Structure formats: structure tokens, C-alpha cells
């Protein structure tokens, strides 16, 4: 494991514990021996107030590679969400999470989670990852929002 990645992730954890957005969760997982695994985080993103996502708490796994922060983490909703920019596997499709697009090593875990929360209510229809959600979002917004509200209710804490 890269010393640079672990050092940066330890800093991220410290910063998060000191100050993070209300309702969000970001915690490194534990290894079988009880030690902390800074390369694998369990996160949760609350649905934004005043949106169909409100009331839901959406669980997300953040996996870091040894070359972090040169490369972005993989962010995956568990279980996968109904959303135009979430692949059927649960992986989030967002430009700041793509090395060849908008990823920069200075981007923090907090910024990633806030960016994903923003994406939930404001899908990028130029970059769809899930055909069904994309089609319903484009063709029947009322039905789309109904499904999102049902999903938020299902994942309420």
C-alpha cells in the first residue's frame, strides 16, 4: 500500500471528524483483525431537503487505489440506486470521479460526497449510465420523481 495514499486518507479522516456536512457519513471500514482499512470507506449521503430525495439516506462505498490521490476513488451505491447517472452495478458516473475528465488530486472526500448529493437531484443527461432511469427522467418526470420518492422512503434511516 502506498504511503502517500494512506497518509492522505488519514488526513482526510481527521478533517472529516473535525468538520463534515450534517447528515453525511464517511467512515473507514475495519479489517478482520480490527484495524482500520483506510482504503475502503462506508459512506452515506442524505437526500437534499426540498427535493424528491429528501428523507432518504443513501449508502455508498468509496474504494481507494494505491495511487490515490493521483487517481479518484470508485464510488458505488450499495444497493444500487434508480438514477440516470448510476450504473446498474451501483457505480456513480460523475466527471470529478474520472481521471481523464475532472478529477484533481486536491478534491476531498467531503467535496466528492457533496458533489454526488448534488448529482442525485440534478442528473447529467449528457452522460447516462442507466437506461431505464434515463428514459423515464427524460420522458415522464412525474413518474421519475414518484420512483425517487419511493426510493427515498425505502432508504430512510
Curated annotation (Swiss-Prot):
Q: What is its main location?
A: nucleus
Enzyme class comes to: transferase
* Site label Interaction with RANBP2, positions: 4, 25, 57
Assigned GO CC terms: nucleus
Pfam families on file:
UQ_con
Localization in the cell: Nucleus
Q: Which cysteines are joined by disulfide bonds?
A: none
PROSITE patterns tied to this protein: UBC_1, UBC_2
Cite the GO molecular-function annotations of the record: ATP binding; SUMO conjugating enzyme activity
Q: Where is this region: Interaction with SUMO1?
A: 13-18
Q: In which pathway does it act?
A: Protein modification; protein sumoylation
> Where does the UBC core domain lie?
4-157
An example GO BP is: heart looping
Keywords (A to Z) from UniProt: ATP-binding, Cell cycle, Cell division, Chromosome partition, Developmental protein, Mitosis, Nucleotide-binding, Nucleus, Transferase, Ubl conjugation pathway
Q: What is its EC number?
A: 2.3.2.-
Which SMART domains does the protein's record reference? Answer: UBCc
Annotated positions for site Substrate binding: 100-101
For this protein, the record's PANTHER family field holds: UBIQUITIN-CONJUGATING ENZYME E2
As for family, the record states: Belongs to the ubiquitin-conjugating enzyme family.
Q: How does it assemble?
A: Forms a tight complex with rangap1 and ranbp2. Interacts with vsx1.
Q: What is this protein called?
A: SUMO-conjugating enzyme UBC9-B
| Source organism of the structure | Danio rerio (Zebrafish)
Amino acid at each position: 500500500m502506498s504511503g502517500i495514499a494512506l497518509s492522505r486518507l488519514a488526513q482526510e479522516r481527521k478533517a472529516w471528524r473535525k468538520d463534515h456536512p450534517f447528515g453525511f457519513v464517511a467512515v473507514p471500514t475495519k479489517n478482520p483483525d480490527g484495524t482500520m482499512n483506510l482504503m475502503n470507506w462506508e459512506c452515506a449521503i442524505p437526500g437534499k431537503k426540498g427535493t424528491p430525495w429528501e428523507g432518504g439516506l443513501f449508502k455508498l462505498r468509496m474504494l481507494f487505489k494505491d495511487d490515490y490521490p493521483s487517481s479518484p476513488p470508485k464510488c458505488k451505491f450499495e444497493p444500487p440506486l434508480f438514477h440516470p447517472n448510476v450504473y446498474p452495478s451501483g457505480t456513480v458516473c460523475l466527471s470529478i470521479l474520472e481521471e481523464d475528465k475532472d478529477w484533481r488530486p486536491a478534491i476531498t472526500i467531503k467535496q466528492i460526497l457533496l458533489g454526488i448529493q448534488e448529482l442525485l437531484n440534478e442528473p447529467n443527461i449528457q452522460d447516462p449510465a442507466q437506461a431505464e432511469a434515463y428514459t423515464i427522467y427524460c420522458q415522464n418526470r412525474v413518474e421519475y420523481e414518484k420512483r425517487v420518492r419511493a426510493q427515498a422512503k425505502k432508504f430512510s434511516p
